[in-house]
């Protein structure tokens, strides 16, 4: 029951937790007189409600409050709720309800209200609990948007799905489709605003799966708007009219329908046919830092903050699962290019952001393409090739620096074909260059700017909307390059964002995201590209069938990994099977996420070589050896050789084919030796001939007779009845004079089609890997140049189960290159893989440390899995952990912020280092804590996201970020970064700076 004392106000009360009423037989353990029969009914009073501040939601026009419900007190009747506006006492709302929450709509913005709540028995009410609030002075982004009805029934309205973007359920061409297997926020707006509570029921093809009480519009999640709002701007909310609820990833699949019911029994339904699901795509991004003839920069933020960046980028790309993995950095101290050039000091080329021979051959071709190929079981490719053998959605991003003829050059700014070359792994450079990998060009559709008709984004980890405009940039219109469209700023206050492929933005927009929010039209193109990628399921490659909404088998020539997503050693190098260019193996790089394959073993381990006398060839030799063949009547037959003696004593070596059934070497009936006009068949004695193995060294030859001498062999590859093999003489492939076929001397010019004049031994190439137990694994690699004008490159994964100590490359008996492998300490610093989505959720990013400053405790170590939670500052080109301790000089005590220095295992101090000291009476005093007696700083806190971190006593923490100075302090009244006035830099001046950065929680 609601009694209104103002006609200007409309009220609806919400049931956030559906109650079916109390059990009248129950009693309250907190109210002893309720069970005392001697106390008069008139004196009984129920418990006073306790209002839950955490579950309070306030917008500009509505409020939701919740309180502890009465646990079935005997004779419980209802709650009385009285709402009034402080500056207009006559506007009073009285609500009578049995539910322990209330939703009140149509309030006045920027006004102060008070709410009294009391619990009542049939005879008396408790004392009132009071809460006051001020409605917000905010802008609702979608407050004027008309309903696009897609929910039908007595509770009709509009439903929208929120994943990377706020989208319609039916699947439109200009926005992403719903992602199968990914969490979603559901927004529901009834056509008529008279509901006080809404229950959402989730149905699958098997029936009802779950029920969720929707949150009222005043409890809609917040946005990514910065906390320090400009005084000229208002708080912006996404909407003040949507009810919301979350659906977990495992219920998000085809066949789902949603039912919405209000407290009056009204029902609205969106059927499964109106909900279009797309593929549960997966994306793998490998990350590596490179230095070519120069030490790697060590500034790859994705690698340094793998957990945070993975979660952040997951919000921008329409996938069901995202995997970020890191490789150990590579310092190329010597470089061999596929053209044979060798660099030990600097490249002979001119380097630039977009140019340089090492940039192309090493960073892109060898490393990024190499890692991609290694994870598909491809062991080698041509040296300069950047071919993207795309099967799965696997991309390798690298940061790269090189020493060139014009000096040290940082590369960046390119992407595509499974490769990303970056200087900055944050902001638009990352989003833009990854976009090229998804098939996107510059200025998609002539240039895509967000606008009033494009959707907002969503961060599923922080549960906040991501605005499609710039929070801090001065308002201006966006004009497409073709001048065909002008997008004016929102409310003349906020400039709309450009898509990543149309300029994007190179700063953090809002309190959450460091990557660009894609325009929904562009996001759909990305989604269409991603859904074509295969995944490995049950030892097969599978692709998504959009008609069946299931994964189906994909036929492919690529190897299927025998182990997926395991720790690997990736071996990279350059080799020349022709032994013309120099070859080189590079120090291996390591990752915790890669694929292992059953790679081809060398034939030479079990294969015979050269000419083999048939009596010495056993069954296994025949099976394991690859034999040279020729075409006989459209069938490949083994080439053989034997000594022929004519009836009149002519002796020569004859090349024929093996008749395996009769165990002879023959030329068949079509080939004969003509002597004195008589045709003599040419065939060996039983089991008395030689077979020719592919394996060996050099060109293949034989001696037809003593007068001709050693000659190279040749054969015919013709489809008709002409066949045979012989020797090369002049410009012909021939046999001994007198050998005829079909009435003609067996002789053919070399330049005609079907004559094979190049026979060489295979000169098999092998990569040999020795582990610490001296076990050797041999892997076959191509024994020929894949491209004639360049060396090949090697790229393959092996297991990390046993450390390796030696790697060698052989072609035939020749060792082309080798490398001794030592322990790599960077393996311990690997953080990956970070897997986001599906059953993994955001577990890899959940905080493990307390928020803010915390005391060092026994056995605490800043390990890989938590170091992203700790605050850091740059000290002499290194990132050091921020710390704080109490410093005393006998006269006074103060807080000092420095950095952590490790003395030995499990022993740390907080220090100012060699450049910062405390000055007293012209004496410089070292700033250093006692051993393990200081505080660390944790910068992770979901609830404080975007809030500035305090130094102490409400002073804002500030940190220097330049090469010349270091340190941390607090902001003084003049907005300078300082510490105590007696803290000085080594130049004798007070530690006081006007250039700094503040730190916020994330």
UniProtKB/Swiss-Prot annotation:
Transmembrane segments: none annotated. This is ToxR-activated gene A lipoprotein. A lipid is attached at residue 22 (S-diacylglycerol cysteine). It comes from the Bacteria. The gene is tagA. GO terms for biological process: proteolysis. The active site is at 433. The keyword Secreted does not apply. Residues 45-139 form the Fibronectin type-III domain. Binds 1 zinc ion per subunit. Its cofactor is Zn(2+). PANTHER family: DICTOMALLEIN-1-RELATED, PTHR39540. Residues 282-536 form the Peptidase M66 domain. Pfam families: fn3, Peptidase_M66, TagA. Its EC number is 3.4.24.-. InterPro entries: Dictomallein, FN3_dom, FN3_sf, Ig-like_fold, Peptidase_M66_dom, TagA_dom. The keyword Membrane applies. It comes from Vibrio cholerae serotype O1 (strain ATCC 39541 / Classical Ogawa 395 / O395). It is a lipid-anchor. GO terms for cellular component: plasma membrane. GO terms for molecular function: metal ion binding; metalloendopeptidase activity. Residues 31-53 are annotated as: Disordered. Zn(2+) binds at residues 432, 436, 442. Residues 1-21 form the signal peptide. A lipid is attached at residue 22 (N-palmitoyl cysteine). It is found in: Cell membrane. Gene3D superfamilies: Immunoglobulins. Keywords: Cell membrane, Hydrolase, Lipoprotein, Membrane, Metal-binding, Metalloprotease, Palmitate, Protease, Signal, Zinc.
